[in-house]
Amino acid sequence: MAEYTLPDLDYDYGALEPHISGQINELHHSKHHAAYVKGVNDAVAKLDEARANGDHAAIFLNEKNLAFHLGGHVNHSIWWKNLSPNGGDKPTGDLAAAIDDQFGSFDKFQAQFTAAANGLQGSGWAVLGYDSLGDRLLTFQLYDQQANVPLGIIPLLQVDMWEHAFYLQYKNVKADYVKAFWNVVNWEDVQNRYAAATSKTNGLIFG
C-alpha cells in the first residue's frame, strides 16, 4: 500500500497575509502537518506488525494512534484547500441556497460557525459538514483531530482551532483569528465539496 504524503500547497506560505502569517503557514504545513503524516505512516507500520504478532493490546493502541494522526492529516489537507489568497466574500449557487434554507441566512450561518469555533474548549476544529443521511448542513465542534463527528458527515469547511494555527500571530485572542479566517475562505472549494457530497454519497451508508 502507498504511504501517506504531505500535500503541496496551491499558494506560497505568505500568500494569506495579513490574515494568516507566512510564518504560521510554514510551521503549520512543514512541521505540524508533516508530523501527522509521519504519525499515520508509523501507526500503519506498527499496526501491521501488531496484527502479524497477534498482539491485541498493541493493535488497539495503534488503531487509536492511527485515528488521531489520520484525522490530523485529513483535517489539514481539507484546511489548505479551504483557504485561498483570493478568498472571502460569500458562497453562491446551490450551497448558498442550502445555507439560506437551513440556517436562515449566510449571516446566521456565519454567526453559528463562529460561535462553534470561539467556544471550542481545548484543541479541535469548527466544521461545516453535509449530513449524507439527513441531506442537511450541520455545524459542529470536532474535538482534537477525530472526536465528536458522527459517521456519514462529509466535511465541507473547517477552521483549525489548535493554538499552533494562530498563536504566533493572534496570541490568546482567537476571536480575531476566526474573524480574519473569513477573509481567506475559498468558497469555490467549499462549493465543489458540497456538489460532490450531494451527488456522490446517496446510498453510500444506507442502500
Curated annotation (Swiss-Prot):
It comes from the Bacteria. Transmembrane segments: none annotated. Coiled coil: none annotated. The lineage of its organism: Bacteria, Bacillati, Actinomycetota, Actinomycetes, Mycobacteriales. It comes from Mycolicibacterium fortuitum. It is an enzyme of class 1 (oxidoreductase). Destroys superoxide anion radicals which are normally produced within the cells and which are toxic to biological systems. One of its GO terms (molecular function) is superoxide dismutase activity. Pfam families: Sod_Fe_C, Sod_Fe_N. This is Superoxide dismutase [Mn]. It catalyses: 2 superoxide + 2 H(+) = H2O2 + O2. Signal peptide: none annotated. Its EC number is 1.15.1.1. Its cofactor is Mn(2+). The keyword Methyltransferase does not apply. InterPro entries: Fe/Mn_Superoxide_Dismutase (IPR050265), Mn/Fe_SOD (IPR001189), Mn/Fe_SOD_BS (IPR019833), Mn/Fe_SOD_C (IPR019832), Mn/Fe_SOD_N (IPR019831), Mn/Fe_SOD_N_sf (IPR036324), SOD_C_sf (IPR036314). Binds 1 Mn(2+) ion per subunit. Mn(2+) binds at residues 28, 76, 160, 164. The keyword Cell inner membrane does not apply. Gene3D superfamilies: Fe,Mn superoxide dismutase (SOD) domain, Iron/manganese superoxide dismutase, C-terminal domain. Keywords: Manganese, Metal-binding, Oxidoreductase. Belongs to the iron/manganese superoxide dismutase family.
